[in-house]
């Protein structure tokens, strides 16, 4: 009975978080500024309009050039987190925000580096004055190139480098071999074996890191961290635990696949969750497990936090976050989606990205622009729709919170 009550309590907790963050209306009210509405003004970004008191309002910085990243908001900043995408409850006053940006000097190096048994695909960058090393772990059936070839993970790398972190990326041994060695049907990291020698993935990472130490590209004296998505999220918890890293951030992962790590870790662990995660092992039950695991870690006196990324409206310029789609083209795609009835009245997308592609396939005449996109551009649209619908995918909406956790897991 106690267990049932505990689960119900967590369901209510998550539900209350969702309801508290769900806007009554993201769509600006008609001009004329009724008595129960006030104005939001956004410079260098999106979200300007009149909103009713009590609405949850989303704002976004403008798209970044390849050599820049979002830095901070000026204005009524007590209302928001300092993220490129932030939201707040509309107060009974006019508010204004202006986005500022930071130039990033960065160039990722790729090479094949000998690990324990095989040459591994490795991407890395060691900025001057680095304050720490961050390892990035792809999800099941992913690869090292996932982090550099997709916009959202690429945005994370820029944020890390801009804030002084070195980055090391490689891939699971099963991916290198293109062989499902344990027969679980996926190409994955070994996340349930907390052994630095017998876990092939951990042995590989140690060998690669030692290579960089021996080249004098970095120092053994700076702290280390890791970030992973899905299976990579579980692996990040296990890796941090095995090598006693300062902290780890697990995206779209509950930690149950990380062996005994949740019960033994001395590393700070942050769980980064999606509100409507559509992976079979996550969803509401997975989010509850992650929250329970975070609490369990805290109960042992180790710092742990979690957050839930909530669904957000689609705005016309959204797809231009990736420069392979212009703002004009993004606006045309948005209009086709809107005209096809795929958006709610508050501009939230109905369902997941597959709804768009099913509609395009069944009625291509309604999507003359979207149906003509290249495969790369289609993938960009899918990636951004996954972000706003909080599907099972990495998202950069909380990069600042993750780096804040790394800087001080007990903040």
Give the residues covered by each predicted segment.
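Primarily recognizes the serine-hydrolase "nucleophile elbow" in alpha/beta-hydrolase
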Residues: 218-266
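Alpha/beta-hydrolase active-site loop
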Residues: 182-216
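C-terminal catalytic histidine-bearing segment of alpha/beta-hydrolase fold enzymes
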Residues: 299-411
């Amino acid at each position: 009975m106690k267990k049932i009550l505990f689960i119900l309590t967590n369901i209510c907790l998550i539900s209350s978080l969702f309801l508290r963050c769900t806007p009554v209306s993201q769509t600006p009210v008609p001009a004329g500024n009724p008595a129960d509405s006030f104005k939001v003004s956004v410079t260098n970004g999106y979200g300007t309009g009149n909103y009713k008191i009590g609405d949850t309002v989303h704002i976004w910085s403008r798209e970044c050039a390849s050599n820049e990243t979002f830095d901070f908001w000026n204005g009524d900043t007590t209302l928001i987190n300092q993220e490129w995408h932030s939201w707040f409850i509309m107060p009974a006053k006019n508010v204004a925000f202006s986005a500022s940006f930071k130039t990033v000097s960065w160039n990722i190096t790729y090479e094949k580096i000998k690990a324990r048994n095989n040459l591994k695909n490795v991407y890395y960058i060691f900025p001057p004055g680095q304050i720490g090393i961050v390892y990035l772990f792809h999800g099941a059936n992913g690869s090292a190139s996932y982090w550099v070839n997709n916009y959202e993970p690429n945005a994370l790398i820029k944020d890390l480098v801009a804030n002084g972190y070195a980055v090391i990326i490689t891939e699971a041994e099963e991916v290198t071999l293109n062989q499902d060695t344990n027969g679980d049907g996926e190409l994955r990291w070994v996340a349930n074996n907390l052994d630095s020698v017998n876990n092939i993935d951990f042995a590989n990472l140690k060998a690669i890191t030692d290579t960089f130490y021996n080249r004098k590209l970095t120092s053994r004296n700076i702290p280390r961290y890791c970030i992973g998505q899905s299976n990579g999220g579980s692996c990040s918890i296990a890796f941090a635990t095995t090598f006693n890293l300062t902290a780890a951030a697990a995206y779209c992962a509950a930690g149950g696949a990380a062996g005994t790590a949740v019960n033994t870790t001395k590393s700070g662990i942050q769980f980064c969750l999606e509100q409507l995660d559509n992976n079979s092992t996550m969803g509401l039950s997975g989010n509850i497990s992650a929250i329970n695991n975070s609490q369990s870690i805290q109960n042992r006196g180790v710092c742990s936090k979690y957050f839930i990324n909530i669904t957000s409206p689609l705005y016309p310029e959204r797809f231009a976050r990736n420069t392979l789609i212009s703002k004009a083209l993004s606006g045309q795609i948005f209009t086709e989606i809107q005209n096809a009835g795929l958006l709610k009245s508050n501009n939230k997308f109905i369902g997941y990205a597959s709804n768009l592609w099913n509609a395009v396939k069944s009625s291509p005449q309604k999507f003359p622009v979207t149906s003509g996109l290249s495969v790369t551009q289609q993938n960009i649209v899918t990636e951004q729709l996954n972000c706003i619908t909080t599907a099972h995918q990495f998202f950069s909406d909380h990069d600042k919170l993750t780096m804040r956790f790394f800087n001080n897991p007990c903040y």
